[in-house]
Amino acid sequence: MHMPPDPDLNSILTLPPGDQAGALWQLLDPPQWPIRFQDLPQGSALVGGAVRDGLLGRLAARPDLDLVVPVEAIGLAQTLARSHGARVVVLDRDRSIARLVLRGWTVDLARQEGATLAADLQRRDYSINAIALTLPQGRAGAVLVDPCQGLQDLAAGRLRAISEANLLDDPLRLLRGMRLVGDLALSIDRQSGGWIRDHRARLTQVAPERVLAELERMAASCSGHQGLALALNYGLLEPWLAGDAPPQSADLLLEALTPAQAQARGLSPDELLTALPVARLALLFDTASLVRLQASRRLQKRVGNLHHWLKRLQGPEIRGALERLAEDERLNLQIDLETDIPALLLHLERRQAETALERWRDPDDPLFHPAAPTDGHTLQKQLQVPAGPLLGQLLHYLKQERAMGRLPAQNHDQELIRTKAAGWLQARAREGGVINYLL
């Protein structure tokens, strides 16, 4: 989960305009960059998030560097990679965009679009993303280039689209705006908000995997609950929402899925990083949603299982619902959500969550980490149970007996296990479910 630094109230935006570029250049600390800025061609400029976040006083310790260069960027990236031992990833061959990956840094190089840097910036999505910092050349220092008045919008805490046409040039920009509003605590310019709402259906023209990547990035953001709630309210998510459409109060439910709420329930920072994104996605999407978004099978399963159990437990008002589940259903829940129990616990009251979390952290807890006390090979050998569905059912029965405390969790008494298994087989035989076994 991306946890940005708290904004600096004395940010660069409060400085006189003539001092801002120099202060930003100093803050960016180019000597720590993985490549020398002197190795870039004259006319190169830093753009994007590093400029924006630096101006806001939210710069990460190792920011992603996005550079516009007045030459073919792929060839330049390959040259720099050879001299710096970096890996090159071609992101867009037609537009000549490449990525350098080295020493934990990401440096994106893009060929300038248009005759000038200003023309390039005017093609972008939002004014706050259309600010560039030129690299020093000789005695000339760094200069801020802001043809779309992004500095004014940053200072005002406002998200403003450069133009309606720019948004439609890549409709994913509609959804990206929601993330920016949440991450940077911005308000949406009225006209821009109208464009986003009017053209929300255009988002279906974007490749599903790109939409999913933006949703995952939003869900993993510290303020992702706000971005998702906003996207929901603007109707951007309608084509992919779960078939059992989320409740009208989904935006309020998302507001409860915050890092502070997770910490209040005892989740560690690492647990929080894993639990919050899937909890947020599962509130809105089910397995079918993730299939339409071409998600991996693993993500389909995680989000789909959690969505199913949230619905089964009547949404976030779970409280005592877990205890009211029948044994077999409770076991199925624990099996389905074994790795994602912390995401479910975000919907519990604090004391319940803390108690359940303590049990989940114990890898030997028989309910929270259900496992059969023996294996199929042993049962086949001892009881002549053939491989197939019956053996699977028997193992599931023994798993349930152990999970519910009717078999020891630790000391696996093989004779007791054999007796339990034999009794189950005999009961099935009497019911006509299996042939009689010589036990």
Predicted stretch roles:
Residues 1-439:
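Catalytic cores of the polymerase beta-like nucleotidyltransferase superfamily
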